[in-house]
């Protein structure tokens, strides 16, 4: 196979020459991604920033930021968005012990996801489940068969879960050096294996050895080896601190493992901070705790209270900028701000969906 890099560099150089002198830096694909992210965030108002940090982001038309729902599903196919190839559940895929096969499955899922997305954008469809950020795989440890979501996992073994999870992430995200085919998300971080009815106020207290040898290896592997683009925090608390604001977990992600993506809460977990756990007095206080801890995106909140938190002095706008920048980086890596001609996955046709080859 001939390398893609010279062609990509040529395309970028030609595009850079064609850009107008007044083109914003964030719109220039020849610029480093971090510089583009910083430039884009600097152009946003506080209310616009807050509106972009929830799953149903409204978008900012004046800057070309699209309306987008970060909530999409692809556990074993993209059938939530209509007809698609549906593969066996994760627990069955894991039973094959064949990580190459799981990689191929995820590669096909990513291709069908891009096909659906490309067609949706062509028809101005911005609905949930037609996006490219997928909250999968579920790499929790399936220890108790009474847990109602065990079939979503790769089983009870941390090594097998790591191998299956890394293979899935690499297949889904693709191998292009510049762009993601789709963005995967490792969930639920951490020690989320039931009991399901108590998940909004349950405090997990695993033995430290069990914590590090059983519950963490898959997450570490997906971050370090799989370069997973997102991590979702769990509803439960861990050692007395809700996972959405747990400094132990964020220290592992950002400082020990070198995570370079974005962190999203499970749906409604910010509300849990002031209703179930009562570690904050209200929504603004909860948002301040979450953003400061390391959370970038919240799911299930109809209206973000981040702007209110800043205006009340509970949070610095620079802290918001840091977390929003992580989100925007994912958008850049998916090619949302670049001409389709530069994004190799933008050409995947809808005919790939539920194709005989898959």
What are the functions of these language-model segments?
Residues 19-358:
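Glycoside hydrolase catalytic-domain context in secreted enzymes
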Residues 1-5:
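Positively charged n-region of N-terminal signal peptides that target proteins for export
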Residues 7-17:
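Bacterial N-terminal signal peptides
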């Amino acid at each position: 196979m001939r390398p893609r890099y010279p062609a990509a560099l040529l395309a970028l150089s030609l595009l850079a020459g064609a850009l107008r002198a007044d083109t914003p830096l964030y719109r220039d694909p020849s610029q480093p991604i971090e510089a583009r992210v910083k430039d884009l965030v600097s152009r946003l108002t506080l209310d616009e920033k807050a509106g972009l940090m929830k799953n149903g982001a409204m978008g900012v038309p004046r800057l070309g930021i699209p309306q987008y729902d970060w909530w999409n599903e692809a556990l074993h196919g993209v059938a939530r968005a209509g007809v698609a190839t549906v593969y066996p559940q994760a627990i069955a895929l894991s039973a094959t012990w064949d990580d190459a096969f799981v990689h191929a499955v995820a590669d096909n899922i990513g291709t069908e996801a891009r096909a659906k997305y490309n067609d949706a954008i062509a028809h101005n469809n911005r609905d949930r489940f037609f996006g490219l950020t997928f909250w999968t795989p579920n790499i929790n440890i399936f220890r108790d068969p009474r847990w109602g979501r065990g079939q979503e996992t790769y089983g009870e073994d941390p090594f097998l879960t790591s191998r299956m999870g890394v293979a899935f992430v690499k297949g889904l995200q693709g191998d292009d050096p510049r762009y993601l085919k789709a963005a995967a998300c490792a969930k639920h971080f951490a020690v989320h294996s039931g009991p399901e009815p108590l998940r909004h106020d349950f405090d997990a207290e695993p033995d430290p050895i069990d914590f590090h040898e059983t519950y963490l290896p898959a997450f570490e592997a997906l971050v370090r080896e799989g370069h997973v683009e997102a991590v979702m925090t769990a509803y439960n608390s861990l050692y007395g601190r809700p996972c959405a604001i747990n400094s132990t977990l964020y220290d592992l992600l950002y400082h020990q493992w070198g995570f370079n993506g974005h962190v999203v809460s499970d749906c409604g977990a910010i509300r849990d901070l002031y209703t179930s756990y009562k570690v904050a007095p209200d929504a603004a206080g909860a948002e301040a705790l979450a953003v400061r801890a390391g959370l970038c995106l919240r799911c299930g909140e109809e209206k973000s209270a981040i702007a209110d938190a800043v205006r009340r002095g509970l949070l610095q706008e620079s802290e918001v900028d840091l977390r929003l920048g992580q989100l925007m980086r994912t958008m850049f890596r998916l090619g949302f701000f670049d001409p389709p001609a530069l994004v190799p996955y933008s050409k995947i046709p809808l005919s790939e969906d539920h194709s005989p080859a898959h």
